[in-house]
């Protein structure tokens, strides 16, 4: 049977409480490809020579949409656009190890897990945290990234010099729907005015840029990318200290999800 590069496991690491960890990517592909050539995933588009991978294509730097194949971008199924980013690079490495061509499927965040469960796609590589709730629905690889939490605000904001979560008290805040940034981190800000969640990361950043909120909470790679796109932003990293957002290890472990019992991957 084919072996997925990251190694299959039903859940992430333990749920001991921890502050935001430093990022440490482990995107090494499987060393052996001989076994991979013999067996292919049965789901996805039904083509045993294709690895069908779902992602938002709107979560830079993990994944994004562009109009050409520059830098090795992969065409999005049913579209003239292409996808690229860390997650696409990971998908291509796995495809190489399995001897399969990678096909990218663009889906909304809330549609990713259902697509895996139904077999519409082989796997999801989309900056997904390995939470207990998700692991009850799908299988996960070992983590390939450990996300760290940051806060974005504007340089002229009253919160630009915040040194801890406590300093964010009273802020108007938002983040992306269905993420730990919105569900777990924002409630930790005292007296925060928490707005409705945004549909995706670009909408989140545009809300901050338009002055609809004082701060947004996200992960470090997204934050660094935002600083390039929005020069008026400043990124606050509380360094995983006691004054940082408190999260469990499972919430910051990023893995690849696949259908329960999919031993081929």
Residue ranges with predicted function:
Residues 8-25:
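Bacterial lipoprotein signal-peptidase II cleavage site
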Residues 44-128:
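Extracytoplasmic small-molecule ligand-binding "clamshell" domains
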Residues 52-54, 73-80, 164-179, 192-194:
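Short loop->beta-strand "edge-of-pocket" segments that line small-molecule binding or catalytic clefts
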Residues 86-88, 103-115, 160, 195-210, ...:
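Short helix-initiation/N-cap motifs at beta->coil->alpha
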Residues 96, 101-167, 242-249:
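Acidic, polar ligand-binding/catalytic clefts
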Residues 146-153, 229-265:
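Periplasmic-binding protein-like
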């Amino acid at each position: 049977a084919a072996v997925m590069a990251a190694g299959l496991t039903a859940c992430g690491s333990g749920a001991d409480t921890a502050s935001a960890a430093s990022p440490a990517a482990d995107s090494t592909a499987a060393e052996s490809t001989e076994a991979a050539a013999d067996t292919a995933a049965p789901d996805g588009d039904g083509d045993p020579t294709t690895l069908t991978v779902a992602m938002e294509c709107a979560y830079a730097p993990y994944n994004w949409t562009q109009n050409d194949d520059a830098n090795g971008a992969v065409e999005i199924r049913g579209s003239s656009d292409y996808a690229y980013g860390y997650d696409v690079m990971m998908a291509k490495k796995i495809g190489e190890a399995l001897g399969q061509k990678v096909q990218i499927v663009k889906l909304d965040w809330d549609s990713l897990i259902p697509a895996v469960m139904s077999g519409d796609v082989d796997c999801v590589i989309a900056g997904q945290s390995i939470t207990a709730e998700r692991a009850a629905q799908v299988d996960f690889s070992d983590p390939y990234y450990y996300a760290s939490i940051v806060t974005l605000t504007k340089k002229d904001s009253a919160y630009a010099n915040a040194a801890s979560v406590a300093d964010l008290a009273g802020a108007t805040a938002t983040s992306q729907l269905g993420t730990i940034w919105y569900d777990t981190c924002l409630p930790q800000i005292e007296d925060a005015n928490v707005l409705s969640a945004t549909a995706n990361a670009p909408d989140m950043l545009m809300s901050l840029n338009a002055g609809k909120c004082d701060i947004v909470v996200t992960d470090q790679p997204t934050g660094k990318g935002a600083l390039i796109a929005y020069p008026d932003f400043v990124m606050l990293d509380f360094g995983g200290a006691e004054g940082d957002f408190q999260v469990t290890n499972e919430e910051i472990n990023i893995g690849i999800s696949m259908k329960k019992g999919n031993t081929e991957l």
